[in-house]
UniProtKB/Swiss-Prot annotation:
The gene is ilvC. Belongs to the ketol-acid reductoisomerase family. Mg(2+) 1 binds at D217, E221. Residues 14-208 form the KARI N-terminal Rossmann domain. It comes from Pasteurella multocida (strain Pm70). Binds 2 magnesium ions per subunit. It comes from the Bacteria. Substrate binds at S414. The lineage of its organism: Bacteria, Pseudomonadati, Pseudomonadota, Gammaproteobacteria, Pasteurellales. This is Ketol-acid reductoisomerase (NADP(+)). Pfam families: KARI_C (PF01450), KARI_N (PF07991). Keywords: Amino-acid biosynthesis, Branched-chain amino acid biosynthesis, Magnesium, Metal-binding, NADP, Oxidoreductase, Repeat. NADP(+) binds at C45, G46, A47, Q48, R68, R76, S78, D108, K109, Q110, G158. Its cofactor is Mg(2+).
């Protein structure tokens, strides 16, 4: 199979990368009606599989789970999750032939095997759904021409998809139809109904493409969402301890600091995050973020280039074929880092202290978010997609570190994201350690920034630069839309 994106000509590639339309709420007036009375079979019952299924059932759809015969016989975790929640469970042979929509929510590396197993069982004119397009775009999976292929990609972990639905809301979602597989012309209707059934239409839906979703998703998770947090955690902890700080305090400052700092992003973007700092600290964080950008721009661009060309996916798939040798080695190395093994700190750190003692961390977040966004946009990805794949998802990933440090982050994210994270962090960590950490000043990390004389013009210009970055402008628009949607949904 050939990488699908690489089979397209340049015009087609640019068209697919640039697919991004914010859908109007009235386009979802019929909500999930298009799929009511149809049989929907979900393959896989992990976080996305279970939680999307729960939402879809609560929206009035007929949901069952197709699992491997051995998973049922051995009562594996997927079988237990599905049965404990009252779902019908059966083998592929039992459930797939009658399915109108088969939703493949297994891990990326299992997709080719799953498709090979289910496609011969699917009835003429059925639909196949994904929540991530790697199998179609990077693997180049060829789907039978009578089958409609759609994607609904919630921009959150599965648990969040469920929690927001229970609150009467939803999570921002990308939907797409594979242009090679829309024989009846109703792919968009299927995707819209599926997105509405998960609650996504209440938070905002982008009509995108498989290509745009895959390329932007890979870029976000490799760089700012996971790679930057991993590299930043390791170098910040090592620096604090080297400076004589209590290892337990250092561990807590980093572990919970990312979540506290990025929570401000959710409410008011980079502007609000920077406004949590004193003027002296804000100017210093801005300066540090520019220094970090200067050192890491090439790495962000390399990751984007390798994602666009298919080099990244080819390298990762070679590791799949080698029994995940590199992935498992890097996972083990991460588990041995000093930060992962830091002692527990029993003392309290106030919310403001995380900002005041984490100026470098704020700078890393700012630099990483802006670099990821700018690099995606420069590669033809629309601003809305780039926003969701950088700033929007960051607080959700930071929350996983708050739970159980880097281990938890790497368990929760997909193996695809984890592999890309290590590729980035393995290069970024030594660069930050050698090029940035030795230049730090008193107050950059672990203690407050000393108050300095503030020049009005300088402060004005820095504030303008922060507020007028393109990610702040599109972010304000998209967060405003989500707030409006939440207000409408609560009435």
């Amino acid at each position: 199979m050939a990488n699908y994106f690489n089979t397209l000509n340049l015009r087609q590639q640019l068209d697919q990368l640039g697919r991004c339309r914010f859908m109007d709420r009235n386009e979802f007036a019929n909500e999930a009606d298009y799929l009511k009375g149809k049989k929907i079979v979900i393959v896989g019952c992990g976080a996305q599989g279970l939680n999307q299924g729960l939402n879809m059932r609560d929206s009035g759809l007929d949901i069952s789970y197709a699992l491997r015969a051995e998973a049922i016989a051995e009562k594996r975790a997927s079988f237990q999750r599905a049965t404990e929640n009252g779902f019908k469970v059966g083998t592929y042979d039992e459930l797939i032939p009658s399915a109108d929509l088969v939703v493949n929510l297994t891990p990326d590396k299992q997709h080719s095997k799953v498709v090979a197993d289910v496609m011969p069982l699917m009835k003429q004119g059925a639909a196949l759904g994904y929540s991530h397009g790697l199998n179609i775009v990077e693997v180049g999976e060829q789907i039978r021409k009578d089958i409609t292929v759609v994607m609904v990609a919630p921009k959150c972990p599965g648990t969040e998809v469920r929690e927001e639905y229970k609150r009467g809301f939803g999570v921002p979602t990308l939907i797409a139809v594979h242009p090679e597989n829309d024989p009846n012309g109703d792919g968009l209707e299927i995707a819209k109904a599926w997105a509405a059934a998960t609650g996504g239409h209440r938070a905002g839906v982008l009509e995108s493409s498989f290509v745009a979703e895959v390329k932007s998703d890979l870029m976000g998770e490799q760089t700012i969402l996971c790679g930057m947090l991993q590299a930043g955690s390791i170098v910040c902890y090592d620096k604090l301890v080297a400076d004589g700080k209590d290892p337990a305090y250092a561990g807590k400052l980093i572990q919970y600091g990312w979540e506290t700092i990025t929570e401000a992003l959710k409410q008011g973007g980079i502007t609000l995050m920077m406004d949590r700092l004193s003027n002296s600290a804000k100017l210093r964080a801005f300066e540090l973020s520019e220094q970090i950008k200067a050192k890491l721009t090439f790495l962000f661009e390399k990751h984007m280039d390798d994602i666009i060309s298919g080099e990244f996916s080819a390298t990762m798939m070679a590791d799949w074929a080698n029994g995940d040798a590199n992935l498992l080695k890097w996972r083990e190395e991460t588990g041995k880092t000093a930060f992962e093994n830091a002692p527990k700190y029993e003392g309290k750190i106030s919310e403001q202290e995380y900002f005041d003692h984490g100026v470098l961390m704020v700078a890393m977040v700012k630099a990483g978010v802006e670099l990821a966004f700018d690099t995606m946009v420069a590669s033809g990805i629309y601003e809305e997609s780039a926003y969701y794949e950088s700033l929007h998802e960051l607080p959700l990933i930071a929350n996983t570190i708050a739970r159980k440090r880097l281990y938890e982050m790497n368990v929760v994210i997909s193996d695809t994201a984890e592999y890309g994270n290590y590729l980035f962090a393995n290069v970024a960590t030594p660069i930050l350690a050698k090029e940035i950490m030795p230049t730090l000043q008193k107050g950059d990390l672990g203690e407050p920034t000393p108050t300095v004389e503030i020049d009005n013009i300088t402060l004005r210009d820095v504030n303008d630069a922060i507020r007028n970055h393109p990610i702040e402008l599109i972010g304000q628009e998209l967060r405003g839309y989500m707030t409006d949607m939440k207000r409408i949904s609560s009435h």
